[in-house]
Structures are given as C-alpha cells and as structure tokens.
C-alpha cells in the first residue's frame, strides 16, 4: 500500500487517521509519510523513501533510531517477561540512577507519560501546600490534562483552539495565566492571590509554542517569588530533561525547582514519565502520605531497562552535548545566511539541540504573543518543501526541531541545501 492509501484507510478507524493530532498534517497540503523504520538519524516510509529525521519522535530519540545498547537491554528483559504489576529491581535501578546523577531529585515516582507526570506533580503540590490555584504560562503545553488546556501550546496552538470542548469551567477556574518571560505578569497574580497559589509550573525551555528559552533572570525571579510565597516551583522538563544537558535546563540556568517532571528521553523511546524532587514533598505521596496517585503500567520493566540504557549512555558521554550544540550552531548559522540571501524574514531560536525557525519579522521571539505573530502559511510552505525533499521537519510552526547524537555534518549540509531551494 502507498502512504496515501494507508492514511486514507486509517481515517476510517482512527479520528483524523492518527493517534495524536499534529501527525495529521492539518496545516499542510500533503499527507503525512507513513513511517516503517528508522536507523540512526534516518527514517524510511512504507514506500521506501528515506528522510533525515529532525523530529526524533518529538524528542525521545536523542541517541538515534535502533540504538543497539537500548535494544540489547530490552531484549534481555523481554526474555524474563513483559510486565508484572509488582516491584522490580529495574525500577530501583533507574530511580537510583536518576536520583544520584540529576540535581534536586531526591525521590522519584515513575508514571507512563509526560501528561501523567505534570498532572501528578500539580496534584502533589496542591496536596502539600493545601492550596488550589496554579500559575501556568501562555503557550506552555504540559499535556492534555483539563487544568492545563488554557492558552496551551502544541497541537492546541497549531489548530488555533482557545481551549478544548469537554473541559468544564470548574476544571480551569484555578488555573491562572501569566506571560512567559514577563516577571510583572507573575507578580500581579501573586499580589492578587497571595496565599492561594500552590504552584508555578513552567517549561524552562518552552518547546510547544516553538522553542523559546526562558530568560535566566525570569527564572531566578520565579524562584524568589515561589520561596517568598511558599509556593512550589515545578520545572516541566518533559522535553528539555536529558536533552539540552544531561541534568536538564535547571543545570544550564542554575535555578533550583522544588519538583521536576520528565518523560520522552528517559523512556528510551518507550512510553514513560516521572516526577521527582525534594523528599519532604515526595513523601506526601501514597503509600507514605495522603496524596493518591497510581498506575498499572508504572515502572514497567521493559521501559525501565530502555530508560536506564539511554540515560547511562548520555551521562557517561558528556561530549555528546558539545557535539549536538556544534551541529546546532552550524544549522542555525546556515539558516540565517539563507534568510539573508533570500530576503526571508525569520528568527531562529535555539537551545543546544532544540530549535525552531519562526517566519517572523520581529527581532526576537520571546513569548506566546510573539510566536503567534509568525507567518504560519510561510512555515507550511517551508515544511511541505522540506518533507517532500526528504528532510523530516515538524508540520507545525509551533513545534520543535531536534538534533541528536547520530546527526552528521552531512545531514546539516543536506538540510541547508534543500532549504536554499525554497
């Protein structure tokens, strides 16, 4: 079957033909390629066409596709069984590894997705503080939990949905919205709801309104405000954790959160998530404390093995991050040169190996409102051209591109050669 035939038949059985909205290419005039396999930095579709992968499964595949050490660990565990719904030594192995190699994670709880990690972290913060309100930032996406679907990024922004039908007003009445990189907007909320705010949750490197790194002074001030008001600071590092640095964005900024959420890379390509932080807070979780959270598949041994194999490679090879940053710098410089040559207004935002090309006339894109001013039609034209030419980029202006360990100088040069023909 061709890609088109598979996609058309998929629409009969899955809403939009996909299991996550952005995969449907709603903003593009092409159908999505149906991916069959991957190797290193390359993907292959059902028709045998090859692509250089700059999406990396939306972040997890930093080590490239079919990483042999991950596959070997997984195969070994599969011989023992798929899952038991019981404690295993593998979940201890991964939990201990994260707690001993990542700053500010004294205890950790495994879950099954980034959404589950963030919603659980917020529940824990509310239980610990005995307060209800949270502050999130316009354009930040923390998963599809009801309380987060207010001015959210990712597919919500791509499809220009203000929220989501099915979310009762009561689910979001305790969600307060501030502007990313704007301290004053946060101070206003703390002044108004001084003793009611349980937590501030933020992506320190936003990746779901396009890549927008936080300003360091902004995060420093958030830390001060949370400390002064006895609120919990939650870093959503589902995307940036183990990616922009092994210890995550918190290590780049030198700002200490109370709780951190993880997913994507920590599962080695398998469904996984986790949240961790100070013992004092984490001990409020059941069975030690009153805050209840559970999961049948949490701590699955196959996933734990894949996660451990992935994180160990990243931790033991810090030069990987230097290499990815070097490639990112080359790609960024090349894109800006093309922009200058062709007279195409754009802004490149990058944090190490996360990047977005904003087709935007502004000098800087630092917030949700800045990102929304981008030319989405121009981005669609760019994405269609790149994808049909074998460069697999996100189909949305508001999603991140990723570089990984297996990308090469030749991959970067090919990207730039194709973009020059836009």
UniProtKB/Swiss-Prot annotation:
GO terms for cellular component: cytoplasm. Its main location: cytoplasm. InterPro entries: 4pyrrol_synth_GluAld_NH2Trfase, Aminotrans_3, Aminotrans_3_PPA_site, PyrdxlP-dep_Trfase, PyrdxlP-dep_Trfase_major, PyrdxlP-dep_Trfase_small. It is found in: Cytoplasm. SUPFAM superfamilies: PLP-dependent transferases. GO terms for biological process: protoporphyrinogen IX biosynthetic process. Coiled coil: none annotated. It catalyses: (S)-4-amino-5-oxopentanoate = 5-aminolevulinate. Pfam families: Aminotran_3. Pathway: Porphyrin-containing compound metabolism; protoporphyrin-IX biosynthesis; 5-aminolevulinate from L-glutamyl-tRNA(Glu): step 2/2. Homodimer. PANTHER family: GLUTAMATE-1-SEMIALDEHYDE 2,1-AMINOMUTASE, GLUTAMATE-1-SEMIALDEHYDE 2,1-AMINOMUTASE 1, CHLOROPLASTIC-RELATED. This is Glutamate-1-semialdehyde 2,1-aminomutase. The gene is hemL.
